[in-house]
């Protein structure tokens, strides 16, 4: 079993760190809100530290799941950052969805200290984290990925290396581009069914077994029909991710017209007060249009 640290105990990180402990790994956690870290320790076998650097001391693997590019830099760099506490040969695995640019920046900074760096954003949402069945798309040196794989398997069902540093983040963008179009299509379909006087749940039971079936349909259609959105992946975070997709698309010359449109639709949802609603709340925008 490995000596590990986990930085960031949000809705994803909290259960992910718990799976590490349940698998028998030694876990030290760090969270900006100390009470959250203490609560985690009260539930799981582990310790908590007051800085990322202290959490990382002696760890073979340091995992993070924080908010954005700046948050990731803050837990990695500087005298209190994880890199300052890590020993040469240790490996940092980042599960945050961030830009591929900051990933490559931190990969280089880690390499200069003799530290491995793997970008491993996740998909599967809060339920996937709680059940330990996340999909993890990774980028980085093959040797570092191979070393970290058994640890990531504590909370990941599908874990794959897609290429060098940044490849994991680019793959996560592909994932979010797919989801944006799927959720908008599902929203339009369910709204259409309602306007046509059909039983939406009965309709989905029929079509979900055919070509229209998807994870979004299977896991979100009932709550969408019932107007329940206090769960899942928040619109605010989806807009952050789509912003990364759109800026990267501009950089590499990839047109994303539907993604750009759906991003604006999510902006409309935010204006309705839905920043913390699940991404499936796109249907509320259609209902608001009448």
Regions found by a protein language model. Give the residues of each.
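Hydrophobic beta-strand scaffold residues
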Residues: 27, 48, 116-118, 159, ...
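NAD(P)+-binding Rossmann beta1-loop-alpha1 motif at the extreme N-terminus of oxidoreductases
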Residues: 1-64, 90, 95-96
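Rossmann-fold NAD(P) dinucleotide-binding segment
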Residues: 52-115
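Rossmann-fold dinucleotide-binding core
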Residues: 4, 66, 98-177
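Methionine-biased hydrophobic packing positions in alpha-helices, especially
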Residues: 12, 16, 65, 86, ...
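Helical "substrate-binding/catalytic lid" subdomain
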Residues: 147, 166-289
């Amino acid at each position: 079993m490995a000596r590990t640290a986990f930085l960031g105990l949000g809705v994803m990180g909290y259960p992910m760190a718990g799976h590490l402990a349940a698998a028998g790994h030694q876990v030290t956690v760090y969270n900006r809100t100390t009470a959250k870290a203490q609560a985690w320790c009260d539930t799981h076998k582990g310790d908590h530290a007051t800085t990322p650097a202290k959490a990382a001391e002696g760890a073979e693997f340091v995992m993070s799941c924080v908010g954005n590019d700046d948050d990731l830099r803050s837990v990695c760099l500087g005298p209190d950052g994880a890199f300052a506490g890590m020993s040469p040969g240790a490996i940092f695995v980042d599960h945050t969805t961030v830009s591929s640019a900051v990933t490559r920046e931190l990969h280089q900074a880690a390499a200069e200290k003799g530290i491995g760096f793997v970008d491993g954003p996740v998909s599967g949402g809060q339920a996937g984290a709680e059940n330990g069945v996340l999909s993890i798309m990774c980028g980085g040196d093959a040797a570092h990925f191979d070393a970290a794989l058994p640890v990531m398997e504590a909370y990941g069902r599908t874990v794959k290396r897609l290429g060098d540093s940044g490849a994991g983040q680019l793959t996560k963008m592909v994932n979010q581009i797919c989801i944006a179009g799927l959720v908008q299509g599902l929203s339009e379909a369910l709204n259409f069914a309602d306007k046509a006087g059909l039983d939406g749940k009965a309709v989905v039971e029929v079509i979900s077994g055919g070509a229209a079936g998807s994870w979004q349909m299977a896991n979100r259609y009932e709550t969408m029909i019932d107007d329940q959105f206090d769960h899942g992946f928040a619109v605010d975070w989806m807009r952050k991710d789509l912003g990364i997709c759109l800026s990267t698309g501009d950089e590499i010359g990839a047109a994303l017209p539907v993604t750009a449109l759906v991003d604006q639709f999510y902006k409309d949802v935010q204006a309705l007060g839905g920043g913390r609603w699940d991404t499936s709340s796109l249907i509320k925008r259609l209902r608001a249009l009448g």
